[in-house]
Amino acid sequence: MSRVAKNPVKLPAGVEVKFAGQQLSVKGAKGTLELNVHSSVEVTEESGELRFVARNGDQQARAMAGTTRALVNNMVQGVSQGFERKLQLVGVGYKAQAKGTVLNLALGFSHPVDYELPAGITAETPSQTDILIKGIDKQLVGQVAAEIRDFRPPEPYKGKGVRYADEVVRRKEAKKK
């Protein structure tokens, strides 16, 4: 059995789980998320905990049990607390402004960059150089943050660009004459 799948997922108060065949639905205060469970994984609920067991003992089934447990744990955490990712803009004239479902970015190009936020994701700009991406789907929050960072990744000489708040940019020394 997978070491990850051995640990059950505890369901906090206010989180509801429903099974419909291989479809698993997690509903909480912040919204609802769904997951198609692999056919080799059996999910059971007992006394406020979800347990994941591989139907047969082969390596693929054990791996899928651990993966499913991690995904469901992220879903439970997302619908109860939510996820957020913070980005920083470093550079002269680099600005961000959130307008509804559009994030307007000035990143030193000859044109502004307008990024359309997907459904279920919100963006806040506490200051012109900080962006806060929030949502209940961990994968989608990370994907949106990565797409925004890809517009202008931090460069190694001056460190200018869009970076994660906890990212350490490795700097290079300028070429010597």
From Swiss-Prot:
One GO term of the biological process aspect: cytoplasmic translation
Record key words, sorted: Ribonucleoprotein, Ribosomal protein, RNA-binding, rRNA-binding
Recorded GO molecular functions are: rRNA binding; structural constituent of ribosome
Domain of life of the organism encoding this protein:
Bacteria
Q: Which GO terms describe its cellular component?
A: cytosolic large ribosomal subunit
**Per its UniProt record, what SUPFAM superfamilies does this chain match?**
Ribosomal protein L6
Q: Which family does it belong to?
A: Belongs to the universal ribosomal protein uL6 family.
This chain's function reads: This protein binds to the 23S rRNA, and is important in its secondary structure. It is located near the subunit interface in the base of the L7/L12 stalk, and near the tRNA binding site of the peptidyltransferase center.
Sorted alphabetically, which NCBIfam families does this protein's record hold? L6_bact (TIGR03654)
Q: How does it assemble?
A: Part of the 50S ribosomal subunit.
Against HAMAP family, the record matches this protein to: Ribosomal_uL6_B (MF_01365_B)
Q: What is this protein called?
A: Large ribosomal subunit protein uL6
